[in-house]
Amino acid sequence: MAISKDDILEAVGSMTVMELNDLVKAFEEKFGVSAAALAVAAPGAGGAAAPAAEEKTEFDVILTAAGEKKVEVIKVVRAATGLGLKEAKDVVDGAPKAVKEGIAKADAEALKKQLEDAGAKVEIK
């Protein structure tokens, strides 16, 4: 018997956030994809190709180093991303790593300032 889409949606709907996180990681490993890359690419998927000369409107905030106040940096990462403590710590420990991707320039600059105020080294790409 094949599993229907409704069965899958029902199962996913009853999962906790941690279970969903594990499921996403399993998809990434099994199929060799990245959920972050899909989320960034998805909004433009239905439109026409953008001209090459167009100004960049989406930016990635990259944490290059946590600095000496690692706990403060973790707090800022949690507040900005909505991640749990372990996930935010993994981002900080895994530097250089993207904290947020595909955000507006003003939001990227604000997040960069918050992270730098907490003691982190940050770059915007």
UniProtKB/Swiss-Prot annotation:
One of its GO terms (biological process) is translation. CDD domains: Ribosomal_L7_L12. InterPro entries: Ribosomal_bL12, Ribosomal_bL12_C, Ribosomal_bL12_C/ClpS-like, Ribosomal_bL12_oligo, Ribosomal_bL12_oligo_N_sf. GO terms for molecular function: mRNA binding; structural constituent of ribosome. The keyword Thylakoid does not apply. Keywords: Ribonucleoprotein, Ribosomal protein. GO terms for cellular component: cytosolic large ribosomal subunit. It holds the Pfam family Ribosomal_L12. Homodimer. Part of the ribosomal stalk of the 50S ribosomal subunit. Forms a multimeric L10(L12)X complex, where L10 forms an elongated spine to which 2 to 4 L12 dimers bind in a sequential fashion. Binds GTP-bound translation factors. Forms part of the ribosomal stalk which helps the ribosome interact with GTP-bound translation factors. Is thus essential for accurate translation. Belongs to the bacterial ribosomal protein bL12 family. This is Large ribosomal subunit protein bL12. It comes from Azoarcus sp. (strain BH72).
